[in-house]
Each structure stands twice: as C-alpha cells, then as structure tokens.
C-alpha cells in the first residue's frame, strides 16, 4: 500500500479493520515500537476524503483507506508534508522528541526543540539561509505545539529537502519512501506489505 498525499493507493479491497493494513493479506509481524508497525496501524477513518476546508474532494475513487488525521484549516499538507507529519507523529508517539527536526529546502535545519525554545526562522534575503531569532515564549512539548511547529516546516520544506535527508534503499519495504524531488516533485510511502498465495504483495 502506498501513502500518497494522504490517500492510500491500492486495489479497492473492502476493509472492516480500524487500521490501514490489508485484511485479505497476511502482513509481516513487526515490533510494536517500530516505524513499520506504526505505519501498519495508522488510524483509519470512514467516509469521504475532505480537504482542509472540510469539503469532500472531487475524486473519491483513488484510495484504499483514509487516515484519521486532522490536517488543520490551512492548505499546507501536500505529499512531502504528509510524510513529514507522519514521521513526526511516530517520533512523538515514541517520546523521541529530540529527534523531531527537518531541513528546509535551502538546507537550514529546524528542530521542534528550537521551536519550543522560542526560536523562529528569519529570512535575510530571498533564497538565502535562515537565521533564527528568539522571538516567542517558551512552549511545552505537547501535541498542539508539535502541530504548530510542523506548520512552519510545511511552508519551507518539500520533496527536495526531504530527498536529501533520506538514504537510498536496496529494496522496497514498509517505511520506504519513493520520491521524485522537484518543483513540483512527488513522493509516496509504503505503509504495508504481506504475503498472498506465497508471494510478496
């Protein structure tokens, strides 16, 4: 199953489970603390795919399942942003707060810890590197503050910066990102695999 811009692209199986794993396919057994297990058990929602304004999108036929994530009220979460969001949600769920951080397209690294300490990006000139100014009050490391931090990341990160952060994979597996960096680029994330009739699916 591929996660692409918040849609699960796969054959249209009928799923009765609360997660996004395929019901007819025996999935791999993974460590409950692992990235793969987290992806296999993303919360599923029923109903239509909605845009950031709460309106059903036109095409409701290109997905297998719908993740039950609130995307907020701004048009910020595109394909790379969705992957950034899910990775951050995983690290948050594991309480690995110090590992949450992403590069902007121009190469500047910005961590959630810096955001919580009040540092905000400042642009000296268009296309230049950011400096950071202590311009806000300290924030606790809560899920609400994570969402606010990610809104900043979405604005300045994308497939180009995400591609530079990733390592090449020898094989496709759960958690593998398939990415085409560019302006625009695109990326997808494998969230499950299994065995059907003795073959990898």
Task: Please place each PLM-identified region on the residue numbering.
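Short coil-to-beta-strand transition motifs
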Residues: 179-187
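C-terminal motif of bacterial Sec signal peptides marking the signal peptidase cleavage site
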Residues: 9-10
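Short, well-ordered loop/turn sites that connect or cap secondary structure elements
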Residues: 166-173
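N-terminal module-boundary/linker segments of secreted carbohydrate-active enzymes
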Residues: 13-61, 65, 70-78
């Amino acid at each position: 199953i591929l996660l692409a811009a918040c849609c699960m692209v796969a054959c249209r199986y009928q799923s009765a489970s609360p997660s996004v794993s395929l019901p007819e396919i025996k999935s791999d057994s993974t460590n409950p603390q692992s990235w793969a297990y987290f992806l296999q058990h993303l919360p599923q929602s029923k109903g239509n795919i909605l845009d950031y304004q709460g309106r059903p999108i036109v095409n409701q036929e290109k997905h297998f399942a719908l993740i039950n994530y609130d995307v907020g009220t701004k048009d910020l979460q595109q394909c790379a942003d969705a992957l950034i969001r899910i990775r951050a949600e995983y690290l948050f769920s594991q309480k690995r707060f110090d590992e949450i951080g992403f590069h902007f397209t121009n190469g500047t690294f910005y961590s959630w810890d810096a955001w919580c300490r009040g540092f905000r990006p400042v642009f000296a000139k268009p296309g230049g590197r950011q400096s950071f100014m202590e311009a806000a009050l300290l924030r606790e490391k809560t899920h609400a503050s994570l969402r606010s931090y990610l809104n900043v990341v979405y604005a300045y990160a994308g497939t180009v910066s995400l591609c530079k952060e990733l390592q090449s994979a020898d094989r496709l597996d759960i958690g593998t990102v398939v990415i085409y960096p560019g302006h625009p680029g695109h990326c997808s994330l494998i969230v499950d695999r299994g065995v059907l009739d003795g073959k990898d699916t």
